[in-house]
């Protein structure tokens, strides 16, 4: 995978812009459950501008967006999509029912994992694995160094040869926007 200006050359898709995609694509939004800005210490009330821009591209393209039901980035993404009156959204949640869906008209997909203890990391990871399998590309938002689940989602998408764009805000003051 190489980046050439704004264009991505990845697994036989030369010159395709990140924001210009087909309607058949599914964007998996993954992020930290903590929304505290490591630089200022304040809690973010809305998504960073770059993330909103990426979501606007997906909305314009009519892509399906899949997002989790956890607090933090998942909830902020859902609130943003509801504010934009976007309907092509599927909310995934662990267990027998989804914990939070910003719009009752959106489809929901509960992922039950009775073989694992409820609330355990493996129980939660089952939902992330299903989302990774259903996505054609990913957008990951890392706001703290401890976002292990988000990093696992990025590596799962990479192993399946799917494009992932990572927005990282580290506690060392460096805002990064990069491909992994």
Q: Predicted segment positions?
A:
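Acidic/glycine-enriched connector segments
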Residues: 31-178
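Charge-dense, intrinsically disordered terminal/linker segments
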Residues: 1-25, 178
């Amino acid at each position: 995978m190489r980046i050439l200006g704004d264009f991505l050359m990845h697994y036989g898709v030369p010159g395709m812009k990140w924001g210009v995609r087909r309607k058949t694509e599914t964007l998996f939004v993954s992020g930290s459950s903590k929304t505290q800005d490591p630089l200022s210490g304040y809690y973010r009330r809305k998504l960073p501008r770059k993330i909103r821009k990426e979501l606007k591209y997906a909305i314009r393209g009519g892509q399906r967006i899949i997002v989790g039901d956890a607090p933090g980035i998942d909830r902020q993404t859902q609130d943003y999509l509801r504010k934009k009156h976007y309907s092509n959204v599927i909310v995934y949640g662990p267990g027998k029912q989804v914990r939070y869906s910003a719009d009752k008209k959106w489809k929901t997909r509960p992922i039950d994992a009775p073989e694992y203890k409820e609330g355990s990391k493996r129980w939660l990871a089952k939902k992330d694995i299903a989302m990774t399998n259903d996505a054609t590309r990913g957008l990951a938002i890392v706001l703290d160094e401890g976002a292990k689940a988000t990093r696992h989602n990025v590596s799962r998408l990479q192993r399946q040869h799917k494009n992932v764009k990572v927005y990282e805000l580290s506690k060392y003051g460096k805002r990064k926007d990069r491909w992994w």
